[in-house]
Amino acid sequence: MRRLLNATIAALAVGTIAIFAKPTLADACAGLIGSNGAVNLGRTTTLAGYQNGVEHYVTAFQFQGGGGEFGTLIPLPGVPSNVERGGAWTLQRLQQETAPPVDEFANGLALRSATYDAEVLLETRIDALDITVLKGGGPDVAAWAEQHGFRLSPDAPEVLDFYAGRSPIFLAAVFDGEAAAERGQQVGDGTPVHITIPTTNPWVPLRILGLGKQASDRIDADVFLLTDDEPALLPAPRANMTLEHSEPATSLLLDDLRADEGMAWVPESAWLTKLQIDSAAEDLSFDLAVDTTGNDSPSPVAAGLQLPVTPDSTGIARSLVPLLSVALLALIIALAARRVRLPGVRQA
């Protein structure tokens, strides 16, 4: 059966929280709001589907009014092969399947300077959204943001490094308020985006939702998973991440999802899981690892609970093992030979 992971991260979830604020706007705090109170990003809902080594992110950014430019930064597990307009109602249909309709979509982040440059891998425009896929470490992405007129919230360096250590790929979605108004977009209108990512290591970013927030600020998000069988999760559901729905997806739901634009990859059968995030920002210090192989072994590294082991460090350590072994053996032989030569020492 095809292997599929779908994660509606209301995740990238509420967050992908406050990403970019132009210098004319205030830094992100509890979501992005302009210094004049006119700019706001609503809740973000994202569907991340994993099938045959390809991850599909379908996310939507909700226009909450205001002018200027503002946006969101999303950590990605790999380099996208395509970024295009997403299905018109897939995310709403998932919400409808598990709960009464609620506001979807999320907010943004804000960035500061560094002396590094991120590599731009892809640029495209979808409606009033300017999409840029970046490759670089935390300082690289921060520098790119400042070079493009955005600010960095105080916690951004730590959060960006948290993700860059696992995957140096980020997607910046910048909302042009004036362009949205010219297009006739109303407050609450969403722009769906479908991101296709070849990867062997899918995960759902959650910590990014707290970017720019105060420790006590609340994070409210929905995470949908669509897998072949009941998935293994790390961390397991807990007080601030409750399991709201876990059962086989109905044929009607899967048929509806496949009927939407760009959603033909949805399988004939799957397990539907819904997690609800209701947490203080300071307590959301992890991501969500999902094991879809049936081995019941989600990765602690993918969950952000362990640091990734770098090739350099492992290579150095491994290369030292034989050298140290030879040195130790030589020392033992030398001591033994010295003991034999010492006068007055009787051998057993």
Residue ranges, per PLM feature:
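Covalent nucleotidyltransferase core used to form phosphodiester bonds in nucleic acids
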Residues: G108-D117, L121, K135-V174
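Bacterial N-terminal signal peptides that target proteins for export
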Residues: M1-I9
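Surface-exposed, glycine/proline- and aromatic-rich loop segments on solvent-exposed faces
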Residues: G49-A99, A145-A164
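C-terminal segment of classical bacterial N-terminal signal peptides
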Residues: V14-L25
